[in-house]
Amino acid sequence: MTAPNESGAITIIMPRTALQRWRSLTQVGFFALFVLAPPLDIFRYDLTIGNFILFGHHWTLNLDALQHGQATATEAAVNVLLFGLLPILLIVVGFLVVAWRWGRIYCGWFCPHFSVVEIINRLMQRAIGKPSLWEQERLPEAQADGSVLRRNRWYLVPTMLAVVGFALLWSVSLLTYLLPPFEIYSNILHGELTRNQALFLLAATTAFCIEFLLARHLFCRFGCAVGLFQSLAWMANRRAMVISFNRQRGSACRSCNNACDNACPMRLQPRTIKRKMFTLSLIHI
């Protein structure tokens, strides 16, 4: 695809690669799963009944049977091992093995929080020329794919709508992981939220608004335990997948506007000492 630039010259716009399209699909799919898992009873914890619900079935340790004398201590211990510790251990080990080999692939390909980070980055860059309020300088309008992203102050409106909208969506979604989803939806639609439900939504929405607007990158880099353990597992593997320098295309860096630094949604600087990153966001920029 081609498009004229400011001087009238034709600029080649690189189409998205198959890998980039797959990444977008996995992000959208996992975000939808994050929102829809509670109402579809795929996974949630119901405080009203005191146990998890997994794929429509109650997932319990069956300790009530021990309290009522209907099971022995040995049977209760086996239930705790098989239905409590073992599934958690398998999930944790599997997650760390994937991170050991492919780095923070969950962050870049699945994490619903990081999907919001990228959307707000893009909107904020359109509004003020920077993907973060803390960025010192505006980024070049010329993008790595050859397109031009022009600044427009009117994009502050959709940026703020996205911040508030995603904050509210996250708050409601988290509440449905703890209480019956359709009860929450009904209470919101009819204005019948209980005091505790209203306080939770108000506090969570406010916190997410602040985080999405001011500290979304800081949370991912320093506050997310899931990201931290992925990084630790990845650093333990000397042969893990990394982003490295392609010497055959080294001459392209002479006319480059630091595209890899500008494209990084986490505001890292791959051209510095942290050049071997452990996500795939910079592939084919």
Predicted regions mapped to residue ranges:
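Membrane-embedded alpha-helical bundles of multi-pass integral membrane proteins
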Residues: T2-G250, D261, F278-L282
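Long, internal scaffold/assembly segments composed of regular secondary structure
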Residues: N257, D261-A263, R267-L282
